[in-house]
Amino acid sequence: LKKAKEIGVSFTAYIAGVLAFSIEKTCKNKVPIAVMIPVNLRALYPSKTMRNFVTFVRVIFAPSSFESVEACAIEAQRQIKVLTAKDKLDAFISTTVKAQRNWILKVVPLFLKTAILRLGRLFMRSRQTIIFSNLGNVVSPQSMGVERYVLNMNVSKNNTQNLGAITTNGKTTLAFTRAIKETLLPETFFAELQKQNIAVK
């Protein structure tokens, strides 16, 4: 968090920047890297629902973005700010609600809707490189005796590695969930953090 503040970005943007920089170092093909970041909508739209009330923002790093970790973090911050602006989110939610209320969609058989949704998900997955989720600070009663939490992200054959972050007792745990044996990305990521003088255990 201290390093993020030094360059004027959020913790989420900083880690997304380090992650994208690390992916670029481990990839042979120089193509845009898309980091998907969940955004908690409760802060903007008060809700009592127990369901997931999130949307995703896609932060895209062009091959020309990778001058340094700092440059990647600043670019991540810029895109997150634009993509999470209330007017952008209002428009997204409005479009989603209109689609759900569309009478044509109401008469379409469920099996057809399910098939279309699956195709949509496949298309979205093809446009993402990795998911990074920061759950933020979690406070537990001392009586629970919890020293740390670990956030394990879901993976799939299309999304073989994801990164989760969670903070408790002033310490942040960053954990990669992998569906593959190769450890090059996690090793590169944590090495980059150490290069930035961030203690890694």
At which residue positions do the language-model features occur?
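Short amphipathic alpha-helical segments
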Residues: F11-A20
